[in-house]
Amino acid sequence: MENKIIYFLCTGNSCRSQMAEGWAKQYLGDEWKVYSAGIEAHGLNPNAVKAMKEVGIDISNQTSDIIDSDILNNADLVVTLCGDAADKCPMTPPHVKREHWGFDDPARAQGTEEEKWAFFQRVRDEIGNRLKEFAETGK
């Protein structure tokens, strides 16, 4: 049986979609091929790498990519993680299921370094919890 494809999209493919890709690889096992991309490619955010490392998931070798139409059109599930991606995501064929799981953008966090770091940790955990729920329930 061929693996299902899940494709996470956000604006810059630097934080949220990268963390979602890392969590999905952890939780979805061999059943899914996991990809992430952005409307633009902003590069991997060092704090996203650090936040995931803190929970034992290494995303440092993931790349920041723009949306690949081949992956998009062959995906079983496309998940947008921010309103910008939901609005600007290219049209998908009818057989591709699309869902929106909105999360705050940790790259836009304000305040002290500690406050910004806490923001990254919170969003990381929210994405992780959502992926765990999806892995357990399929929803």
Curated annotation (Swiss-Prot):
Disulfide bonds, paired cysteine numbers: C10-C82, C82-C89
CC annotations in GO: cytoplasm
Catalytic activity: arsenate + [thioredoxin]-dithiol + H(+) = arsenite + [thioredoxin]-disulfide + H2O
Induction of the gene: Induced by arsenate, arsenite, and antimonite.
Summary of the knockout phenotype: Mutant is sensitive to arsenate but is still resistant to arsenite.
Activity regulation information from UniProt: Activity is potassium and sulfate-independent.
EC number: 1.20.4.4
Keyword field contains Oxidoreductase: yes
Keyword terms: Arsenical resistance, Cytoplasm, Disulfide bond, Oxidoreductase, Redox-active center
Top enzyme class: oxidoreductase
Gene3D superfamilies: 3.40.50.2300
A biological process from GO: response to arsenic-containing substance
UniProt subcellular location: Cytoplasm
GO molecular-function terms, A-Z: arsenate reductase (thioredoxin) activity; protein tyrosine phosphatase activity
Keyword Oxidoreductase (UniProt): yes
Top-rank taxon: Bacteria
InterPro entries in the record: Arsenate_reductase_ArsC, Ptyr_pPase, Ptyr_pPase_sf
Job of this protein: Catalyzes the reduction of arsenate [As(V)] to arsenite [As(III)]. In vitro, can dephosphorylate para-nitrophenyl phosphate (pNPP).
Family of the protein in this entry: Belongs to the low molecular weight phosphotyrosine protein phosphatase family. Thioredoxin-coupled ArsC subfamily.
NCBIfam families: arsC_pI258_fam, PRK13530.1
Quaternary structure note: Monomer.
Protein name: Arsenate reductase
Lineage: Bacteria, Bacillati, Bacillota, Bacilli, Bacillales
